[in-house]
Amino acid sequence: MRQLPPFSSKVFLAPMAGVSDPALRLLCKELGAGLVVTEFTNIHAIVAKEAQLHNISEFIEFSPRERPLSVQLFGSDLEALERAVKIVSPHFDLIDYNMGCPAPHVTEQMACSALLQHPDLTRHIFRTMVNATDKPVTVKIRAGISTPDRFLEIARIAEEEGISMITFHPRTVKQGYSGKSDWSLIKELKENVSIPVVGNGDIETPEDALRMLNETGCDYVMIGRAAMKNPSIFKQIKQYLETGKYDQVSDGERMEAFFRYLEYTKLYPTIRFVNIKMQAMNFTRGMKGGKGVREKLRTVKDEGELREVLMVLRTENNL
């Protein structure tokens, strides 16, 4: 196991396809996230782009201000995986491997959570990655396919092959994101490995984060969906863990955070407007008048129209 970089807090931002773009990652980092992770990236795409790019940051955009920064990969072809790891290794602080995504369009490619059923291949994947880099290699897993019967075996293989940290989302692939995540499985995992464990799933408040840490013994927690509407949750959790209390976040502060995000998107040409619009819809969830605003946001065609809609909400709510 390689030494992990120091983290400024115990709270990490989850990699989320179409969501955790570099602008949101930078915002969350500034608001207290101890680690941010890129959206998952296909190893074949990295290899294919290598000859066209002067630097991998032209394909996977990021800012030095995000550090420590983890890049998440998926794909099971060992030759492509080795090459992809070598390409990204000089540019990132950690390399994460996705064995958690339940989406059929990736599991059908023998990738992500489909690999939970293939421990031998998984061992070769971990070994290939660790041997291809001097950076810490980490993995994100689920509990199993239809029952929680795979995570301990995969975790033991990970530890044996030199994986430095495991992030665990204790739902099955069949569950997707429905039902409740079973935190008792995080506790079971932590009791069976000696490497750091990151708990993930159903953390909506600072109280939830502390409860997960206390109930499971996990070393860190990872926030996904809750950060989509309130990126200040990282600051709140950090405050709560350090002092036992935290500041409430007003709708005005959430709106300010979105406009900060909007400014950051200008630094990254690969962020599409459709994603910016989706982020605006996420940020307005729970706000007074937010439902009507989201209906209007669905039809906006550019940043100017988006700003007009949000400025009306700010004026009406005195934000």
Residue ranges and their predicted role:
Residues M1, F7, P22-A23, R127, ...:
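Alpha/beta catalytic cores of nucleotide-metabolism and tRNA/nucleoside-modifying enzymes
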Residues M1-F7, M16-I87:
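Glycine-rich, positively charged N-terminal anion/phosphate-binding segment
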Residues V11-P15, V36-T38, L69-L73, I95, ...:
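Hydrophobic faces of well-ordered beta-strands that scaffold small-molecule active sites
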Residues E82-I95, M99-Q109, D120-I195:
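Alpha/beta enzyme core
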